[in-house]
Amino acid sequence: MLHIKYDGKIYEYAEGTTYEEIAKDFQSKYAARIALVIANGKIRELLKAPERDTEISFLTYADDAGHKSYVRTATMVLMRAMYDILPEVHPDQIKVEFSIGKGYYISVRGVNLTDAIVAKAETRMRELVEQAEPIHKQAMPKDEAIALFVQMHMDDKVKLFRYRRSSMINVYNTVSYTHLTLPTTSR
């Protein structure tokens, strides 16, 4: 059993219990949805499990880091939806250009985004959220990640990775889509 300290109290959890499962026990204490955990002072993803006794607190969508995690996940869901409805579109053609109020301006190079396409994308995004398809994290060597993103025509990511010092890169994927993100498509 692991001892998890939250808000000054100790709770026991079986080894292998993820932060996401732990977060469910405390979600009712938060007005916004829990997005990330702070474990022993470090921000962690909910899909991880504590490996030893840990002191935790949570970040929600209302917190900057939690909101950014939500936006990355929503972007992945959007890209997956676009890929599903327009399979000829490469991920590098889809750009999150800038924020507008609480929304984001998205462009798809080479595609005239009609109302019909936007409606299909929204419908597909809602389906993906409803399915709550798990998002899996995979740490891969930098060279393999670069090769993967070259194959996916994600040139901006390839350029960024070339300057990355770490030898490993975290890549996130659903059953049929790979990207750099929350534990499910519903978060």
Predicted regions mapped to residue ranges:
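Short, ordered beta-strand-loop transition motifs
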Residues: 98-102, 164-165
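A generic structural motif
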Residues: 102-109
